[in-house]
């Protein structure tokens, strides 16, 4: 008997990263695939003071004190907001789902970076979006291409990750942030700005969010505690311009009533506190060491195979292969060597037209195992390249 599924189910794609992580459960496998925080850096949390009342239903907007704390944090970054514009969500992934429901019908145009976050593409395309890709450069999007796209199309929104982008690790320059804000204002395009990695910075660089520079365009700004505290809490937030917030709140109510209050309570014990700042300092130093270990191993084993930039934050290296193999074809061979990685092709709107990229996570594999893991992966790529050239 044929099931009466919705039309959108024909666009439902499996998550490649979930499939890879499932295949990599053996303890001997070295995984450079996911964006998992290092388990050694998951902070010890205290539940002793959790009020019994947190077991009750809560407000769809989220806990008032947490909303106040997030609004204060955002204002310090230059985001013009009050607590009444903050919505606590079940991880910032839910922001993408809510924005998809708010804006996207079949054929709706959405502007994204090339490459962009894989799970955002999946959400937008599930709802029927036609994604318009603008190429990334080392300091942000190609501005000429961005202007040309906005002249020729009318996207419902632009989805951008300007600070240590996933997957490319690009951080937009100040000049690019100003220019992007100016273009979105000029063409009246809503901005969805995603900043899960802002706190994971390894140099002294900093840049105000793009939403803080907008003068006319509507906006949504989203973040999470998953990369700095505990991803298992499933606590994120969105802040939205006043014209969008009521619709996002109603969509949240219809999706899951409210984000879990126990996770919200725990997040509130950390945000803005001295022990949170101390934890962030330890986290940055820990990941800087792992970033440097991966840089050394890549220099040793990949210099003849790929090019890359040293990331100044986030959790990833983005490699461009000198011989543009379809990196998806390397997965099974790498797994046979007890190594997994994330192919770069699925991060593009047109995967088959963009072969030869790898995303490597440096947060999860211990520094002392990194060299061996990347040596094995380099050999897999070298062997595949020789086969293709033969």
Located regions from the model:
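Short, conserved charged micro-motifs
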Residues: 325-330, 368-372
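N-terminal small-domain helix-loop-helix segment of the aminotransferase-like
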Residues: 10-94, 98, 272-273, 340, ...
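Hydrophobic residues in well-ordered beta-strands that form the structural core
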Residues: 112, 133, 191-193, 267, ...
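Conserved glycine-rich beta-strand-loop-beta hairpin in the small C-terminal domain of fold type I
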Residues: 268, 285-295, 307-320, 332
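Conserved core segment of the aminotransferase class I/II
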Residues: 212-285
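Conserved core of the PLP fold type I
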Residues: 54-187, 198-217, 287, 368, ...
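PLP-dependent enzyme catalytic core of the Aspartate aminotransferase-like
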Residues: 1, 336, 351-390
